[in-house]
């Protein structure tokens, strides 16, 4: 029968790479399957694709087995199941609350028993959640799970899980508490209504029964002995009934007391979580204060260094200013023109020239005397320059 393989071929062509080089068929084909694969390249291609997909599945399975999540992830998932059950029970409890709050004359004892049962189950689920959180906290403190030490990344994940699930548990617990408070407010509205005393009602009924029985006995003319026996039997039955009712009431009170103790333990656990959260906040505040002290000390050191550098900068500026003043005064003194000194130098030079002219005609002794006279004439100008320099230095100081 003819089969259309066009769609299969197109799908293979779209998914398979186009740079595949097929064999030329020189290799010997041993069996019919090899002949078919050599004759039809797409069959060979499909075989390669299936082999490749099989290898990829094996690799994925191996990688998945190597990269399994930590065990505490499975432990924490139990909290999700418990919280889901708490939500379901809370919804049922809210429906029963609404039904019981409607006015009516039917007997609501069944609804009250159902309310107590659902409340007890919700508290049990919350207790299980707290037990799981306590186990996660123990794992986080010991940093070991099933003999294996947790890494830093796993500890961070575990810490985040604790915070997330603690918030979820607290949210569900608050919802349950709000439901109970609303129902208690509804019940407290009937506190001021007159309540009929059960004992008085029973006594009244008993008196009526006794009167009717006495009248009946009188009418029938029964003996006093039979009447006394029946009265004793009736009293014994009433005593047994009252004892059973008393025991039943005591049993209900004990059950309510146990549930109240369970609720109190739940409240204390919530208070423990609040204390732990407050301790964490206080630790963070203490850590931030310590960091602030360290940073303030480093800032104080930097300010002291800056003050020291500022003082040194001022000293350097003063020294530089004085140096510039000295240099300016030095150049001023060197470049200042002196009238008396220059005239003395000119006279001395003229005399020296005249003496040189005379040395041509006179002897060597006369020339030496003239030179001595020239030096003596230059002394006043040198003294004047020295006095001017001293005056400038005095002005600077």
From Swiss-Prot:
Transmembrane segments: 318-338
One Pfam family linked to the record: SNARE
Basic and acidic residues bias spans: 353-374
Keyword Transmembrane attributed: yes
Cellular component annotations (GO), alphabetically ordered: cytosol; endomembrane system; endosome membrane; Golgi membrane; SNARE complex; trans-Golgi network
Subcellular location: Golgi apparatus, trans-Golgi network membrane; Endosome membrane
Gene Ontology MF: a single term: SNAP receptor activity
Entry keywords, A to Z: Coiled coil, Endosome, Golgi apparatus, Membrane, Phosphoprotein, Protein transport, Transmembrane, Transmembrane helix, Transport
Coiled coil: 74-96
Residue spans, topological domain Cytoplasmic: 1-317
UniProt membrane topology term: Single-pass type IV membrane protein
InterPro entries tied to this protein: SNARE (IPR010989), Syntaxin (IPR045242), Syntaxin/epimorphin_CS (IPR006012), T_SNARE_dom (IPR000727)
Residue ranges, compositional bias (Acidic residues): 386-397
Primary localization: Golgi
UniProt key word ATP-binding: no
Membrane topology, Vesicular segments: 339-397
GO biological process, one term: vesicle fusion
Residue ranges of the region described as Disordered: 341-397
Positions of post-translational Phosphoserine modification: 109
Gene3D superfamilies: 1.20.58.70
Similarity comment text for this entry: Belongs to the syntaxin family.
Subunit structure: Interacts with VPS45.
Record PANTHER family: SYNTAXIN, SYNTAXIN-16
Functional description taken from the UniProt entry: t-SNARE that functions in transport from the endosome to the late Golgi and on the endocytic pathway.
Protein name listed in UniProt: t-SNARE affecting a late Golgi compartment protein 2
Source organism per UniProt: Saccharomyces cerevisiae (strain ATCC 204508 / S288c)
């Amino acid at each position: 029968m003819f089969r259309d393989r066009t769609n299969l071929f197109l799908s293979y062509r779209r998914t398979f790479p186009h740079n595949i080089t097929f064999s030329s068929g020189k290799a010997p084909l041993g069996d019919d399957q090899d002949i078919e694969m050599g004759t039809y390249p797409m069959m060979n291609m499909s075989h390669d694709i299936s082999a490749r997909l099989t290898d990829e599945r094996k690799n994925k399975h191996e990688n998945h087995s190597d990269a399994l999540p930590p065990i505490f992830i499975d432990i924490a998932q139990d909290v999700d199941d418990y919280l889901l059950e708490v939500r379901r029970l809370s919804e049922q409890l809210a429906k029963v609350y609404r039904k019981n709050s409607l006015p009516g004359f039917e007997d609501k004892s069944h609804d009250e028993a159902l309310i107590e049962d659902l409340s007890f189950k919700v508290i049990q689920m919350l207790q299980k959640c707290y037990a799981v959180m306590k186990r996660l906290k123990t794992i986080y403190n010991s940093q070991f799970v099933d003999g294996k030490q947790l890494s830093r990344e796993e500890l961070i994940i575990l810490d985040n899980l604790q915070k997330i699930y603690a918030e979820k548990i607290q949210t569900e617990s608050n919802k349950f508490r709000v439901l109970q408070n609303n129902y208690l407010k509804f019940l407290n509205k009937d506190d001021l209504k007159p309540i009929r005393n059960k004992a008085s009602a029973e006594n009244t009924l008993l008196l009526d029964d006794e009167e009717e029985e006495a009248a009946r006995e009188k009418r029938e003319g029964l003996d006093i002995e039979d009447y006394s026996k029946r009265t004793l039997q009736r009293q014994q039955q009433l005593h047994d009934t009252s004892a059973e009712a008393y025991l039943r009431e005591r049993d209900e009170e004990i059950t309510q007391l146990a549930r109240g103790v369970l609720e109190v333990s739940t409240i204390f656990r919530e208070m423990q979580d609040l204390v732990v959260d407050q301790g964490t906040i206080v630790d963070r505040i203490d850590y931030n204060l310590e960091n602030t002290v360290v940073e303030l000390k480093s800032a104080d050191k930097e300010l002291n260094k800056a003050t020291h550098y500022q003082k040194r900068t001022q000293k350097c500026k003063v020294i530089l200013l004085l140096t510039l003043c000295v240099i300016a005064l030095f150049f001023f003194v060197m470049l200042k023109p002196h009238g008396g000194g220059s005239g003395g130098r000119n006279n001395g030079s003229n005399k020296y020239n005249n003496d040189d002219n005379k040395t041509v005609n006179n002897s060597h002794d006369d020339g030496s005397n003239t030179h001595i006279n020239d030096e003596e004439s230059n002394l006043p100008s040198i003294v004047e320059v020295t006095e001017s320099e001293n005056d400038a230095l005095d002005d600077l100081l």
